[in-house]
Amino acid sequence: KEGYLVELGTGCKYECFKLGDNDYCLRECKAKYGKGAGGYCYAFGCWCTHLYEQAVVWPLKNKTCK
């Protein structure tokens, strides 16, 4: 599974500005989903890869980013 890293409190994606390989996104994806996860910046949001199937990613049901 893969998807955008989401802030559970707000429903917003984690923003990033350096597209492609991005240390911030990689670090945040690993912190949230475990050391096996990967991450990079895609369309100004942190995109996480190699996630477990139950991982929560953006968009959240019933919670829109404001």
Swiss-Prot record:
The keyword Secreted applies. It comes from the Eukaryota. It is found in: Secreted. Expressed by the venom gland. Residues 1-66 form the LCN-type CS-alpha/beta domain. Keywords: Disulfide bond, Ion channel impairing toxin, Neurotoxin, Secreted, Toxin, Voltage-gated sodium channel impairing toxin. GO terms for molecular function: sodium channel inhibitor activity; toxin activity. CDD domains: neurotoxins_LC_scorpion (cd23106). GO terms for biological process: defense response. InterPro entries: LCN-type_CS_alpha_beta_dom, Scorpion_toxin-like, Scorpion_toxin-like_sf, Scorpion_toxinL, Scorpion_toxinL/defensin. One of its GO terms (cellular component) is extracellular region. The keyword 4Fe-4S does not apply. Disulfide bonds join C12-C65, C16-C41, C25-C46, C29-C48. Gene3D superfamilies: Knottin, scorpion toxin-like (3.30.30.10). Pfam families: Toxin_3 (PF00537). Has the structural arrangement of an alpha-helix connected to antiparallel beta-sheets by disulfide bonds (CS-alpha/beta). Beta toxins bind voltage-independently at site-4 of sodium channels (Nav) and shift the voltage of activation toward more negative potentials thereby affecting sodium channel activation and promoting spontaneous and repetitive firing. Acts on human sodium channel Nav1.6/SCN8A. Also able to weakly shift the activation curves of human Nav1.2/SCN2A and Nav1.4/SCN4A. Belongs to the long (4 C-C) scorpion toxin superfamily. Sodium channel inhibitor family. Beta subfamily. Is neutralized by the single-chain antibody variable fragment 10FG2. Abundance in venom is approximately 6.2%. This is Beta-toxin Chui4.
